[in-house]
UniProtKB/Swiss-Prot annotation:
Family: Belongs to the long (4 C-C) scorpion toxin superfamily. Sodium channel inhibitor family. Alpha subfamily.
Function as written in the Swiss-Prot or TrEMBL entry: Alpha toxins bind voltage-independently at site-3 of sodium channels (Nav) and inhibit the inactivation of the activated channels, thereby blocking neuronal transmission. This toxin expressed with the pET-14b vector has low inhibitory activity on sodium channels (11.33% on rNav1.2/SCN2A, 15.96% on mNav1.4/SCN4A and 5.04% on hNav1.5/SCN5A). When expressed with the pET-28a vector, this toxin has higher inhibitory activities (44.12% on rNav1.2/SCN2A, 25.40% on mNav1.4/SCN4A and 65.34% on hNav1.5/SCN5A).
Disulfide bond positions: 31-82, 35-55, 41-65, 45-67
Alphabetized SUPFAM superfamilies for the sequence: Scorpion toxin-like (SSF57095)
Signal peptide: 1-19
Protein name, per record: Alpha-toxin BmalphaTx47
UniProt KW keywords: Disulfide bond, Ion channel impairing toxin, Neurotoxin, Secreted, Signal, Toxin, Voltage-gated sodium channel impairing toxin
Domain-level remarks: Has the structural arrangement of an alpha-helix connected to antiparallel beta-sheets by disulfide bonds (CS-alpha/beta).
Length: 85
């Protein structure tokens, strides 16, 4: 029984756990990407490893790109001010 637990744990560590999140993609200054059309955001999001993306109109940060299943390594908009604009 203990062998089964150890083997299961080892397999979990070897395969790794990847998580994604749905969020506004941000640049290095904590600013969202302004958009008008969905194809722009979908292209931006998928190039950064997300499954898809679209332009969120009149959202919390205005018209900004929203990504679906964005990898953890990609910066997202967090609370606080946009430092670049």
């Amino acid at each position: 029984m203990n062998y089964l637990i150890v083997i299961s744990f080892a397999l979990l560590l070897m395969t790794g756990v990847q998580s994604g999140r749905d969020a506004y993609i941000a640049d290095s200054e904590n600013c969202t990407y302004t958009c008008a059309l969905n194809p722009y955001c979908n292209d931006l999001c998928t190039k950064n490893g997300a499954k898809s993306g679209y332009c969120q109109w009149a959202g919390r940060y205005g018209n900004a790109c929203w990504c679906i299943d964005l990898p953890d390594k990609v910066p997202i908009r967090i609370s606080g001010s946009c430092r670049g604009r």
